[in-house]
């Protein structure tokens, strides 16, 4: 901002928030916030549409509502008779219900069999629906993914889904702001997934509670859009309401030509507006945290929350070293569930299943990363590779990545959420260990009794070809 500009310096978050306040909050009432984009899937939307029917309401802005199917969809191909091999009747009913709701209320749906169908937080950006400066909501925890574009994006509950459908607005209290400055440069073999796991390990699962995180610094600027989406995707795992990254030329180049993005002179005008979004010099955050990644290694979780992560060369921590009784009890409980011993190296830990996919790491760049490790090798454990969307799957097949996975012995599946949350039949057996590129390692997340170790696609692929936790840097030259 210029020295003569009378406006106060503002953060990226404040600029987007201020532009969408319909009615300011008071001590008694939340702000009324306008929503630019409402993304939907089959699991959290049925009750919301039922509410509309009961009250005789219409969807206020179907043109700002976009739906897909992902959580309940099978990742196996169609049966010879053309039917989809749903895991159970509930999954099939959920998909059928959103198809009916979309027809009845005029909502655009990209469902099973559609070439654009995919995991909601992968397919939305691919469609160009997510753009800088927007407010974006979805009935899904990892809506923060879209903050990578300089949007304010957050998950909402089912009742709020109904509220947005009916009014295109939400009642919201303004969160506080938290800057996560990432200094240094990521070393070869270290990825955005390793970075966000390290950040969460540093601040804890409650470190961002009540805040919107803005990721800044040279290491963030050096990330691709895919890496930025991975970073923002897991902001919620650090307790944040949302995660954001200021848009720049990387953002604009990624968006150019996408279906829903303005074209020609209109795109140039949009970029000019978007360039005004980054945080002003002198703007103040409520909190600031600095992370130095110059010596960061590939990360892997060992416990039952995403903050319980260590370098792949590290050892399982000893609960006895924890001075805080609550933290000690949490760690003891995690190690009991995971059946891991304090002081044991995580390298060499036996793995039963590997999962590459999800809204965290199911994009083309992620699949390339995994293929680079698997190329010319054979997997030693069951490995599922699930593209985040049909567009990603098609692009991966055009590059021959599917052949690399198949020749290695991995299963090349249809797009969907898959083993991220074990809702569609892709799940662990009790006691199995899975190195997963997803975002949550809670007890039973990937199936009752399943044990999840979160990691990057490269680390997951290294585990697949080793049959145990392995350092991907040792398997890839350069």
Swiss-Prot record:
NCBIfam families: leuC, PRK05478.1, PRK12466.1. GO terms for biological process: L-leucine biosynthetic process. Disulfide bonds: none annotated. [4Fe-4S] cluster binds at residues 359, 417, 420. It catalyses: (2R,3S)-3-isopropylmalate = (2S)-2-isopropylmalate. Pathway: Amino-acid biosynthesis; L-leucine biosynthesis; L-leucine from 3-methyl-2-oxobutanoate: step 2/4. Heterodimer of LeuC and LeuD. One of its GO terms (molecular function) is 4 iron, 4 sulfur cluster binding. Keywords: 4Fe-4S, Amino-acid biosynthesis, Branched-chain amino acid biosynthesis, Iron, Iron-sulfur, Leucine biosynthesis, Lyase, Metal-binding. Binds 1 [4Fe-4S] cluster per subunit. Its EC number is 4.2.1.33. InterPro entries: 3-IsopropMal_deHydase_lsu (IPR004430), Acnase/IPM_dHydase_lsu_aba_1/3 (IPR015931), Acoase/IPM_deHydtase_lsu_aba (IPR001030), Aconitase_4Fe-4S_BS (IPR018136), Aconitase_4Fe-4S_dom (IPR036008), IPM_dehydratase_rel_enz (IPR050067), IPMI_cat (IPR033941). It comes from Anaeromyxobacter sp. (strain Fw109-5). Its cofactor is [4Fe-4S] cluster. It holds the Pfam family Aconitase. Catalyzes the isomerization between 2-isopropylmalate and 3-isopropylmalate, via the formation of 2-isopropylmaleate. Belongs to the aconitase/IPM isomerase family. LeuC type 1 subfamily. This is 3-isopropylmalate dehydratase large subunit. It comes from the Bacteria. It is an enzyme of class 4 (lyase).
């Amino acid at each position: 901002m210029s020295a003569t500009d009378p406006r106060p310096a503002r953060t990226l978050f404040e600029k987007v928030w201020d532009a969408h306040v319909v009615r300011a909050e008071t001590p008694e009432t939340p702000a009324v916030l306008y929503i630019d984009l409402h993304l939907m899937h089959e699991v959290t939307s049925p009750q919301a549409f039922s509410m509309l029917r009961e009250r005789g309401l219409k969807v206020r802005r179907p043109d700002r509502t976009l739906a897909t199917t992902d959580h309940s969809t099978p990742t196996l191909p169609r049966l010879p008779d053309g039917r989809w091999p749903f895991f159970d009747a509930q999954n099939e009913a959920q998909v059928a219900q959103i198809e009916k709701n979309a027809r009845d209320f005029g909502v655009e749906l990209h469902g099973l069999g559609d070439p654009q169908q995919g995991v909601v937080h992968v397919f939305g950006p691919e469609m160009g629906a997510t753009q800088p400066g927007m407010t974006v909501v979805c009935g899904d925890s990892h809506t923060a993914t879209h903050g990578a574009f300089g949007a304010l994006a957050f998950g909402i509950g089912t009742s709020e889904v109904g509220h947005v459908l009916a009014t295109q607005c939400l009642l919201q209290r303004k969160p506080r702001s938290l800057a996560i400055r990432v200094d240094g440069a990521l070393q070869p073999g270290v990825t955005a997934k390793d970075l966000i796991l390290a950040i969460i390990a540093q601040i804890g699962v409650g470190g961002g509670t009540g805040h919107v995180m803005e990721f800044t610094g040279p290491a963030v600027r050096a990330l691709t859009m895919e890496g930025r989406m991975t970073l923002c995707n897991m902001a919620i795992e650090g307790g944040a309401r949302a995660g954001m990254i200021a848009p720049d030329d990387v953002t604009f180049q990624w968006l150019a030509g996408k279906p829903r993005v303005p074209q020609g002179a209109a795109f140039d005008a949009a970029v000019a507006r978007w360039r005004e979004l980054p945080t002003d010099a002198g703007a103040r955050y409520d909190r600031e945290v600095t992370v130095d990644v110059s010596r960061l290694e590939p990360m892997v979780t060992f416990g039952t929350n995403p903050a319980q992560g260590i370098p792949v060369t590290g050892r399982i921590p000893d609960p006895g070293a924890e001075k805080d009784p609550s933290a000690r009890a949490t760690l003891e409980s995690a190690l009991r569930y995971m059946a891991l011993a304090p002081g044991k190296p995580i390298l060499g830990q036996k793995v039963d299943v590997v999962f590459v996919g999800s809204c965290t790491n199911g994009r083309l760049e992620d699949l390339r990363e995994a293929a680079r490790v698997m190329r010319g090798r054979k997997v030693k454990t069951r490995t599922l590779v699930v593209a985040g969307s049909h567009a990603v799957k098609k692009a991966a097949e055009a590059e021959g990545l599917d052949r690399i996975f198949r020749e290695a012995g991995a299963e090349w599946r249809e797009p969907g959420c898959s083993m991220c949350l074990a809702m569609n039949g892709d799940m662990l057996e009790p006691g199995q260990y899975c190195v997963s590129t997803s975002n949550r390692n809670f007890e039973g997340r990937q199936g009752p009794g399943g044990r999840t170790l979160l990691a990057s696609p490269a680390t997951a692929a290294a585990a697949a070809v080793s049959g145990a936790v392995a350092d991907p840097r040792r398997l890839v030259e350069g």
